[in-house]
């Protein structure tokens, strides 16, 4: 009888110990590293200088099944051209593809200016003083600024989105892409044009 009781006590102890092991507290930790590509450039002499003011990072929003959009501000500096009667500033996309080495999937970055899509084929006009178009870049388009001999600056902003994706050369939805990171350059070309009668630059 004593042996039976002892066996019961031992069994109960083992069971209790098992439950105690399952209930042990634990700590789980995750870390992520963010990387910024860094380059320092100073240019205060060129006729046109455009400087992006932030980098672009798109994150997939699982609930929306799409990537978030980014507002990318940029600084524009021009060297006024004395004698100019009109000034025009236009832009178009040069490169906008993100890719990765783990597979052949690609993402296309769309660029919008005041809601209008920029393209690779046609210039999007930002400023045209002959038509009174300034697109909010009033400081550059002001009479006595673009046609002066001084430098002037203003700030604009593009909206960047992940417009579409492809895999194996065919269009695919974002949800079908495997997890990972895509990298690449988004390049927008700006062209500034002054029309007027200019004094020839002195010979060096």
Sequence positions of predicted segments:
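A generic short-segment signal for beta-strand/edge and adjacent turn/coil regions
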Residues: 3-7, 38-45, 55-59, 123-129, ...
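Compositionally biased, low-complexity repeat tracts
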Residues: 3, 68, 76-79, 128, ...
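A broadly tuned preference for mixed-charge, low-complexity surface segments
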Residues: 25-31, 90-95, 128-146
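Alpha-helix boundary/interfacial micro-motifs
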Residues: 15, 21, 132-133, 197
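N-terminal small/polar-rich segments of proteins
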Residues: 24-117, 161-164, 169-204
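Extracellular/luminal beta-rich ligand-recognition
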Residues: 104, 108-137
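Gram-negative bacterial Sec-dependent N-terminal signal peptides
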Residues: 1-25
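Acidic, glycine-rich flexible loop segments
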Residues: 130-173
């Amino acid at each position: 009888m004593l042996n039976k009781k002892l066996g019961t006590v031992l069994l109960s102890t083992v069971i209790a110990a098992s439950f105690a092991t399952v209930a042990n507290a634990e700590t789980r930790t995750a870390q992520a590293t963010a990387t910024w590509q860094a380059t320092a450039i100073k240019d205060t002499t060129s006729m046109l200088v455009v400087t992006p003011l932030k980098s672009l990072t798109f994150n997939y929003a699982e609930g929306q099944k799409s990537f978030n959009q980014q507002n990318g501000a940029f600084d524009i500096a021009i060297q006024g051209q004395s004698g100019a009667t009109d000034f025009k500033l236009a832009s178009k996309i040069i490169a906008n593809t993100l890719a990765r080495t783990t597979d052949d999937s690609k993402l296309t970055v769309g660029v919008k200016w005041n809601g209008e899509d920029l393209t690779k084929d046609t210039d999007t006009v930002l400023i045209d003083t002959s038509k009174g178009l300034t697109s909010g870049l009033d400081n550059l388009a002001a009479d006595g600024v673009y046609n002066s001999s001084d430098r002037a600056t203003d700030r604009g902003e593009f909206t960047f989105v992940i417009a579409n994706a492809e895999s194996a050369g065919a269009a695919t939805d974002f949800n079908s892409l495997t997890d990972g990171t895509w990298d690449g350059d988004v390049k927008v070309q700006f062209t500034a044009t002054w029309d007027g009668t200019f004094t020839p630059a002195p010979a060096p």
